[in-house]
């Protein structure tokens, strides 16, 4: 059995980054003014942010079926008979199902793991899978490990403007309804408990209270300094740094990394969003 490990740009990394690690990465598509472009390879992160500032209507979609098929056919010609895939989660995209369909059409074995999220967690899982396979760990043990990562990770979103998420259908009906209430700041989360959909964790009146509610939630989960903490933002660096400092001041020993939020996600959360990702497995998901 020869296995090819496959992901997509929902990880927040350019395909070339994954190529160096021996992992195949397909680009998600971003559409603006009727034209679809491959994320990172045909439209840059800064270009996406600029279009958001210009109030352009942006949409995202899974990698083109043609590109998935071309990739898998090339892998089959190179002697691979199995695809091991960790793409963006099913709750946000049909990528996983499309990959499985095309692998089946090409009579290749398919192992797909739902990350129930995207970005850091997704990248962590595909890289962990590749490393474990190279260490001769059985596939069923690899799957169990990835499932444990998905079970234990927590991702919480604070959005200034929910219009983008409502337009894209990335919110559950309850979350969308709350977004329309005057002065309400829903605290949103995504993970296995929400089946990979963005849902409401709580609702508060101000962004400060929203941040305080997130920190309270982490303490309720017994999150401590042994966890990985990452704050990802959509063109809101100052706000993200302040949020990170608040977390570090209230969770003893916590060290928070600040990064840009994946463009294909930022399109739906809108400018000003700050996302907090935590994981109890820093060696796997840092």
Model regions: which residues?
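Short, conserved loop-to-beta-strand elements that form functional interface hotspots
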Residues: 252-268
